Amino acid sequence: MRMKENAMKNGQLKPAYNVQHVVDAEYITWLTVAPELTDITTFIPFLKRIEKNSNFKYLKIVDDARYESEENYSFIEENNQISFIKPSNYEISKTRKYKNDISRIDNMDYYSESDLFICQNGKKLIANWIKIRKSKTGYESVKTIYICEDCSNCNYKESMH
C-alpha cells in the first residue's frame, strides 16, 4: 500500500493495512483489517463478514463519504438495508459557486419521460451513448453520456467546458 511520503521523499512502498470497525451504541462490535487501498472496496466484504460470523445483519448503515459508490449503494439496496452515507460532494454542493455552475448536470432540468436535460440556454442534451465500466471487483457501472443537440451561437458555450 502506498502511504504518504516520508521525510526522505522517496515514495517507497511501506507495509500498511486498512482498519475498519463497526460501532453500535458506542461499543465496537466488529473489527477487520484489509490490504485494500481504499475504503470503497472494503465495504461489501466487511458487511458480509459481519453477517456471516455474527449471524446478525445491520439494517441501517451509517458511513462517511469514503464509502460512497454505486456498487456499495446497490449492495445495500439488494440486501434490504438503508444507507446513510454522506455524499462525497456534499460540502462543495452547498457552495454558491457549485449551485451557479451551469455546466454541472445537477443544475440542469431533467425530463425522465424523454431522458433528456435542458441546459441554461434552453437547448436539449440528449442521450448519445452508454458507457459501461467494470470495476476491479467485477461490478459493472452503466453511465449515459449526453450531448447538446446544437451548441452553435450559444452564449454559455465557453462556461460549459
PLM features per residue range, with description:
Residues 1-161:
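Anion-binding and metal-coordination hotspots
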